[in-house]
Design a protein with these regions (language model features):
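Membrane-embedded helix boundary and interhelical linker motif in transport proteins
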Residues: 12, 34-79, 83, 259-260
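Helix-loop-helix "hairpin" substructures at the membrane interface of multi-pass membrane proteins
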Residues: 17, 137-216, 240-245
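Short, non-helical or kinked segments that cap or interrupt transmembrane helices
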Residues: 19, 28-50, 90-95, 166-169, ...
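Transmembrane helix-bundle core of multi-pass membrane transporters
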Residues: 87-163, 190-193, 256, 262-269, ...
Length: 295
């Protein structure tokens, strides 16, 4: 029988993992809210941010590397939108989805070519990895920092969307793309800002994830990306609060499943079983709005 401290550590671990999924899931849900596009390359942007840090930190201090990594991640996200999605804006959705999958494989194979398929050690960030004693529990500082930083970023994002001009434009475009164009809203600027925000949050998630995990490989973005996608669908894709809540639920459940040796092997399967159940029982997710097709 485990004591209370064991379950508290599991809960903290689940909240931390859920926070990382939330940061990635917001990128999925924002892009879908604006473009009705599932950006399947989003998990690979997260992976590329990890490699940016590996190579930049080899010649720069962490104080320089972290801002540079975030900047390069944002530029990568915007470049993908301009090169792979913008030319297909009026194309059938299937064409855009195939393009997104193609970009995902392109990034994976590019990383594989550069690294030779070998995992690279992530630079140590002592501020994150230092072990703290909190209430008799020995936990890494990153376990506390991750959920706090995630909540702070989500609050800032909600304020930006609700209170600023670009945020109001985003809400207008997500409601009615065609009418927003007719009303003079700069659609390209709104879409670019959406990719800037999503890629920035993926970059932050990458730093927090790999600082704790310790190494980066070309395929490592696939599973966190897919789990974040499930979180976005669970909460209601297009809903930022829904994506965050869905991510926390998945992270906590995953943590408790992994702690049970009998069913630990099914931790990944649980996430995708949950996706099937959601699609069967509540296709719009917990907080998603029912969309109507215009004819």
């Amino acid at each position: 029988m485990h004591d209370a401290a064991f379950y508290i550590q599991l809960l903290l671990s689940g909240v931390t993992v859920g926070s990382l999924y939330a940061l990635i899931a917001i990128g999925y849900t924002m892009v879908y809210g604006i473009l009705r596009l599932i950006n399947f390359a989003h998990g690979d942007i997260f992976m590329m941010a990890g490699f940016f840090m590996v190579y930049i930190s080899a010649s720069c201090s962490l104080a320089v590397s972290i801002p540079l990594v975030l900047l390069l991640t944002v530029l990568l996200g915007v470049a993908i939108e301009r090169a792979a999605y913008k030319p297909l804006r009026t194309a059938p959705r299937m064409s855009v989805m195939i393009s997104a999958i193609g970009v995902s494989y392109l990034l994976q194979n590019l990383a594989n070519y550069i690294t030779g398929g070998i995992a690279r050690a992530y630079p140590d960030i002592p501020f994150f990895t230092q072990v703290m004693n909190v209430g008799g529990l020995s936990i890494k500082r990153i376990t506390i920092i991750t959920p706090i930083l995630t909540i702070a970023l989500v609050v800032v994002l909600v304020i930006l969307i609700q209170k600023t001009k670009i945020g109001m434009a985003m809400r207008a475009v997500s409601r009615d793309f065609e009418t927003s164009q007719l009303m003079g809203i700069k659609i390209n600027s709104v879409i670019s800002m959406t990719f800037v925000i999503g890629s920035f949050l993926a970059g932050v998630a990458s730093i927090l994830y790999f600082a704790n995990y310790g190494q980066v490989s070309p395929m490592i973005g696939a599973m966190p990306g897919l789990k974040a996608f499930v979180a976005a669908v669970f909460g209601g894709i297009g809903s930022i609060p829904g994506a965050v809540i869905g991510a926390f639920i998945i992270g906590i459940c995953e943590s408790f499943i992994k702690a049970n040796e009998t069913i630990a092997v099914f931790s990944n399967a649980f996430t995708f079983a949950l996706l099937i159940v959601i699609l069967l029982c509540k296709p719009n997710g917990l907080f998603g709005e029912k969309l109507t097709e215009k004819v």
